[in-house]
Amino acid sequence: MTDFLSSVTRKLTCKTFLIERMITMEEHTVDLLRECDSGCAMAAESLEQIRDFVSDQGLWNEITASYEKHQDLDLRIKKTLRAMEEQGKEPGKMASAWSWMSTEMRMMAKGGAKEAASIVTDGCNMGIKTICGYKNQYSGASKAAMELADELTGMEENLRNHMKKFL
């Protein structure tokens, strides 16, 4: 009888562990996707804003192409969240306001392609640091969510590299 109870207890403990792990994975997946959603939206807002100041056609094209890629990725992230019956996350109001204000001030003070590229580079670096931090925080997220986060950081790294010729 004791062996039987020990066996049942082990099986229940194992099942409980697996259920808890699945719940944690789903929570981490949703949280990571929400942060990626917010990051994509923040990047797109910033790129759209800075684009209005840019007169250099090459820089404008780079920013526009990246804006469209961020929009496309954000749609895929939102679709994934909807499939999980979850909502996305908007960028924080204070972060958005600060980003908008600092961009406006920097572009009014200095302006030009060099300053625009510098602002975009700073934004890319912030995005990379932020999303990598969330990947570490939500390390239990699904492989698909991690891949979307990697795609976002890859886009930021690519855009940052394309900005070098304008700095």
Where do the PLM segments sit?
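Inter-helical turn/loop segments and adjacent helix faces that build the functional surface
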Residues: 49-61, 134-147, 166-167
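Carboxylate-rich helix-loop segments that flank metal/cofactor sites and access channels
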Residues: 75, 79-128
